[in-house]
Amino acid sequence: MSKQKHSASSGRWLKEHFDDKYANEARKKGYRSRAYFKMEEIQTKDKLLTPGMTIVDLGAAPGGWSQYAAKIIGDNGQIIACDLLPMDPIAGVSFLQGDFREEAVLDALLERIQPNMVDVVMSDMAPNIAGNNSVDQPRAMYLVELALDMCRQVLATNGSFVVKVFQGEGFDQYVKDVREMFKTVKVRKPDSSRARSREVFIVATGYKG
């Protein structure tokens, strides 16, 4: 992609962002990001979160999902969050900055988690976009595969998984893989997700262990 095209695309994203009612509402209410509303919509439909839960949040920064989840799970719950980028503190959230694709970071993350004791794994991870779908889609699918592998390592029986996935090559097979591991799997497109975005959210419940 040329710099001119990339600049035009970036400019369009910025205009959409500042015109977007969800982004504006997030700023007004002091929410970390518009992602707060995506998790709120998923929770309204699927009731994944309950007080006292233990949650792992991958790709957490700037903290929209953790911020919403912390409100639901309360003081008796805990959230272990991880991201490459820094994240301002959130009460009830233990944050680890680093790339969990690296063994040392993954080990540090797992040290904070009791095996098979996590109630929900949630992942809003996305790769740095190159503007070339043949590059971007495999990168995105690699991240969601890692998130699914995290479920295998830490999720309790009957636990839940919510993950952002971009539709494209590998998507259908990924949904099949998730269905093999969970009793119920739904694909959600929240109203707060931009219509032209290929992102959807897989909501899986009843981890078979």
Swiss-Prot record:
Catalytic function, reaction form: uridine(2552) in 23S rRNA + S-adenosyl-L-methionine = 2'-O-methyluridine(2552) in 23S rRNA + S-adenosyl-L-homocysteine + H(+)
Superkingdom, natural source: Bacteria
HAMAP family, per the entry: RNA_methyltr_E (MF_01547)
Residues binding S-adenosyl-L-methionine: 63, 65, 83, 99, 124
Active site residues according to the UniProt entry: 164 (proton acceptor)
InterPro entries: RNA_methyltr_RlmE (IPR050082), RNA_MeTrfase_FtsJ_dom (IPR002877), rRNA-MeTfrase_E (IPR015507), SAM-dependent_MTases_sf (IPR029063)
Keywords, in A-Z order: Cytoplasm, Methyltransferase, rRNA processing, S-adenosyl-L-methionine, Transferase
GO cellular component: cytoplasm
Entry similarity comment: Belongs to the class I-like SAM-binding methyltransferase superfamily. RNA methyltransferase RlmE family.
One of the record's GO molecular function terms: rRNA (uridine-2'-O-)-methyltransferase activity
Subcellular locations according to the entry: Cytoplasm
EC number, as in UniProt: 2.1.1.166
Protein name: Ribosomal RNA large subunit methyltransferase E
Annotated function: Specifically methylates the uridine in position 2552 of 23S rRNA at the 2'-O position of the ribose in the fully assembled 50S ribosomal subunit.
Claim: Kinase is one of the keywords in the record: no
Entry annotated with the keyword Transferase: yes
